[in-house]
Amino acid sequence: MANYTGANVIVAGDVTKYQPDAFGFGIASGDTETTNFFAQTTNDIFRQLRVEWWPVYKTNIFTDITVLNTAEMVNTKVNLDQFERAGVYLFLGRFFLPALTKFRPETQKDRFERMAEYYMGQYNIEWRMILEDGVEYDTDADGTIVSNEREPLHGFRRLTR
C-alpha cells in the first residue's frame, strides 16, 4: 500500500529496523522532540524534491507552456514509501544523532558525531539512487503508479520520439 496520506515519511519502527538501539540513548521514540524530527525529515525530503526533481518532472510532463511556471508539486501525490530508507538516514544523520552529540573537536568526535556523518553519507547515496531510479508521483491521483508516473531525475522520456 503506497503512502499518499500526507503522513510522515517514517515512524519510530522504521528507525529501529536500521538502528535497533536508537531510542535507548536518552531521547525516546514517543518524545515531542522525536515527533518534531519526524516532521522535519518529511519536510526536508519534500523540499529537496521540489528543488532537485520537480523542475525536471514538470518540464517533461506538462506540455502546455503556460502551466510550467505555475505548476506546484502536490505532496500527497508523492509515494513516500520509496523514501523510507532515505528518511531514516536523514532522520538519524541530520536531526536525531546531532541532538545526542557533544560536538567535540575533530580529533575527539564522539560516537554520535561519527554515526551522524555515516548516516548523512548514506542518505546522499540513497537520495541519488531514488532520483536516478525514478520518483513515483501519482499524477492522476488514482492511488496507483503506472510506468509513466515514475520519473527519473534526468527525464529519459524527453529523448523518445
Write out the residue ranges for each language-model feature.
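Elongated alpha-helical scaffolds
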Residues: D81-F95
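Short loop/turn elements at secondary-structure junctions
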Residues: Y4-G6, I27-D31, G93-R161
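Conserved short "hinge" loops at termini or chain/domain junctions
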Residues: M1-F83, D138-R161
